[in-house]
């Protein structure tokens, strides 16, 4: 595998782990729902990044790709969106959604554990889900990433609109959010 790719995957893994620990610490200190959701999202991102690191260093395999795909494509963005929902709406809405998301996450993990693969993995070739999994894992990834990404984008736009409507010193923050929103779009 490419040394640069392996190095970047290692770096991303370590940065994600640090962010996961920082957000978990914030949740531990403040017990705010959005911190717990973001800690989960960053932990999933770290797991996916570590799987990528492992795969680029040693080669892709069935198990490594399942971990990478489950943590990164299926689960991560949904937990990130839950954090945005919790931040914008509060616990009355976020806590029931967290229970539902936990159940859906358990279902998705179960599907990914037992989903049959359609062809063997080539160790030094980045796998594509459509080449290895049937429809259900790919639908879970599409829904688990697409809908939450839309929620994150709409939440960011709603935050900008609220700041602009208030016309307070935070209005300057809204202009900064306008720059951050396209970055969130690319990241999701």
State where each predicted segment sits:
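Juxtamembrane loop-transmembrane helix junctions in multi-pass integral membrane proteins
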Residues: 2-6, 26-29, 33, 60-67, ...
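Alpha-helical transmembrane segments in multipass membrane proteins, preferentially the mid-helix core
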Residues: 18-24, 79-86, 138-171
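Membrane-interfacial loop-to-transmembrane alpha-helix junctions, especially the N-terminal start
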Residues: 30-42, 95-101, 172-187
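Internal transmembrane alpha-helix with an interfacial aromatic "cap," most often the third helix
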Residues: 19-27, 53-54, 60-61, 71-103
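Structural signature of hydrophobic alpha-helical transmembrane segments
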Residues: 3-15, 66-75
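Extracellular-loop-to-transmembrane junctions of the mid-late helices
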Residues: 4-12, 114-158
């Amino acid at each position: 595998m490419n040394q640069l790719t392996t190095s970047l995957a290692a770096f991303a893994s370590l940065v994600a782990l640090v962010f996961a620990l920082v957000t978990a610490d914030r949740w531990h200190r403040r017990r705010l729902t959005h911190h717990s959701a973001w800690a989960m999202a960053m932990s999933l991102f770290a797991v996916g990044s570590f799987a990528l690191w492992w795969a680029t260093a040693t080669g892709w395999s069935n198990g490594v790709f399942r971990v990478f795909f489950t943590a990164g494509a299926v689960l991560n963005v949904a937990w990130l969106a839950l954090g945005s929902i919790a931040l914008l709406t509060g616990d009355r809405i976020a806590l029931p959604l967290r229970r539902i998301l936990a159940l859906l996450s358990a279902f998705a993990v179960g599907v990914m554990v037992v989903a049959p693969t359609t062809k063997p993995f080539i160790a030094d070739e980045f796998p594509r889900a459509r080449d290895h999994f049937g429809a259900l894992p790919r639908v879970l990834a599409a829904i688990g990433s697409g809908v939450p990404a839309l929620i994150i984008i709409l939440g960011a736009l709603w935050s900008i609109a609220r700041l602009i409507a208030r016309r307070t010193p935070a209005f300057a923050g809204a202009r900064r959010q306008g720059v951050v929103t396209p970055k969130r779009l690319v990241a999701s």
